[in-house]
Amino acid sequence: MQKKLPQIKIREWNEKPRTKMRFIKIGDIFCYQFSEEMFVFGQILGKVNVGHVIQFFDIFQASPTITVEELSRAQFIGKSIIIDSYTLFDRSPVWSWQIIGHQVDFDPSPFKDLAFKWGDPNGLQFGKVWLDGRTEPKIFSREEVDDLDWEACVGSIVYNRILEEELASRGNKGV
């Protein structure tokens, strides 16, 4: 029995270089021009107050063109991170991040327990917010949320490090 392909609609790179914030959806597929010769793909997993939560796929290519078959075989790499989607997809002067598709049947439930912490980094009490927007009325101690990432957008240093580590594990081979 053949595995059913996900329901993904794909468009060409630069077909629509800018995506306004209000049109970014959970399940969107994006392409990021990681270097002059390399593109990487990923997916929007959720939305939090400060941006969108994404995760990269294990697909590194010399071209921003991808097929549904390639996406159906893709695995997530690294950790889920929050990006400043307004700046990257809507207002960037250089369109190195583009929404290139959408997975209609995307199921975010495997990420329902993904949470981030918020609060004063120097403080003693913190809050917790989940990917689906749930918040906990309880205040947590530093120890209780120590293993969580901050509900804050990460910059290129963080997401490029994730990608560089993956490439290093492959012996710097993109494909």
Feature names for model-found ranges:
Residues 1-50:
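Short N-terminal edge-element motif at the start of the domain
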Residues 4, 15, 21, 35-36, ...:
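Residue-level signal for the start and early helices of compact helical domains
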Residues 19, 65-67, 87, 135:
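Residue-identity detector for threonine
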Residues 26-31, 38-45, 53-59, 79-84, ...:
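Ordered hydrophobic segments in well-structured contexts
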Residues 52-77:
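Short solvent-exposed strand/turn elements
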Residues 75-175:
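Beta-strand-rich cores of mature extracytoplasmic or soluble domains
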